[in-house]
Amino acid sequence: MTKRTAAKYKIDRRMGENIWGRAKSPLNRREYGPGQHGQRRKGKLSDFGTQLRAKQKLKGYYGDLTEKQFRRIYAEAERVKGDTGENLIGLLERRLDAVIYRAKFVPTIFAARQFVNHGHVEVNGKRVNIASYRVKEGDVVSIRERSRQLAIVLESVGLAERDVPDYLEVDHNKMTATFVRTPALGDVPYAVQMEPNLVVEFYAKN
């Protein structure tokens, strides 16, 4: 198991949930956190603990974002007109690495970040190597022609455990994904419940 894979599954164990719905998650075999004290029964969380956990789960889901990265996205969600929690989800789903993951071009959000950083992705025909790049409605994201036969891409396209959401129009023959619209929370195919409203409560008090 690579360090990246180990870190990913550590997030699952820390959250106590198989947050990406992966068949290989250790949470499919045991239901306790990492470390020597992981098997201790957890008590009921306080309001603060529940809010913190909701924030950590979202940060982890999108590739274990740093607090600085996540706080910056949240601050923008606050500035935009509308519900802050919904805005937060929309901004996270507009990240280029998230689009690559949702389109099933790669198997994990961690692989998506690395894939973008290594220059395998184009947006509207121009190479973009910034995972946090924010796509707009109508943008066409594609895998560069020289990268389309990579094993990681071919294997991911065939994965049965994930479906492509309807806010993307994906052509796996041409390896393109059009970002149709910014999704609402209910549109996003999370494997577990995400609660951005609790994230809003967390930052309102801290």
Swiss-Prot record:
UniProt-listed InterPro entries: Ribosomal_uS4, Ribosomal_uS4_bac-type, Ribosomal_uS4_CS, Ribosomal_uS4_N, S4_RNA-bd, S4_RNA-bd_sf
Domain (S4 RNA-binding) ranges: 94-157
Region of interest called Disordered, as start-end residue ranges on this chain: 23-47
One GO CC term on file: small ribosomal subunit
Protein's GO biological process: ribosomal small subunit biogenesis; translation
This protein's UniProt keywords: Ribonucleoprotein, Ribosomal protein, RNA-binding, rRNA-binding
Keyword match Membrane: no
PROSITE patterns listed in its UniProt record: RIBOSOMAL_S4 (PS00632), S4 (PS50889)
Pfam family, one: S4
GO molecular function, one term: rRNA binding
PANTHER family in the cross-refs: 30S 40S RIBOSOMAL PROTEIN, SMALL RIBOSOMAL SUBUNIT PROTEIN US4M
Family statement: Belongs to the universal ribosomal protein uS4 family.
NCBIfam families named among the record's database cross-references: PRK05327.1, rpsD_bact
Complexes and interactors: Part of the 30S ribosomal subunit. Contacts protein S5. The interaction surface between S4 and S5 is involved in control of translational fidelity.
Record-given protein name: Small ribosomal subunit protein uS4
Organism: Paracoccus denitrificans (strain Pd 1222)
Protein's gene: rpsD
